[in-house]
Amino acid sequence: MTRLKWGDTLRNPQLVEGDQLMRFNVVVANPPFSLDKWGADEAAKDPHGRFWRGIPPKSKGDYAFITHMIETTYVDPHENGRVGVIVPHGVLFRGGAEGRIRQQLIEENLLDAVVGLPANLFTTTGIPVAILIFDRSREQGGANADRRDVLFIDASK
């Protein structure tokens, strides 16, 4: 089933049942790149606990979207919760809070693949982008927890 809602995904998620975020088998998005003022001031009080890995910088909301997407996929190994997200290349390299969140995602063994795409792919920006694939079945206790590899694809040429 497909459910679409209009709203502010980070400040006021619309896909909820009761007081819980809805869970999905697959979540795919192309969120706004490096969104400024995404709601960092409110993240520490998030009623859904999405930012337990850390709060991304106020001026860069990329990891806020990534974290939200991961937290809305199934953890159950039989449900295969997967995430595909298009991000600016900076998401792969920036330090500080973003570096700590990225490290946590890697330590959780969630990152499955990184696909580097060329610059000028989008008409609205010339920066290179990447597709990140996360797989919840790789978590401890999951069906693919023994997989520790990450597939890197250079599709930038």
Language model features with spans:
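A conserved structural/catalytic subdomain of Rossmann-like adenosyl-cofactor enzymes
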Residues: 6, 11-13, 17-157
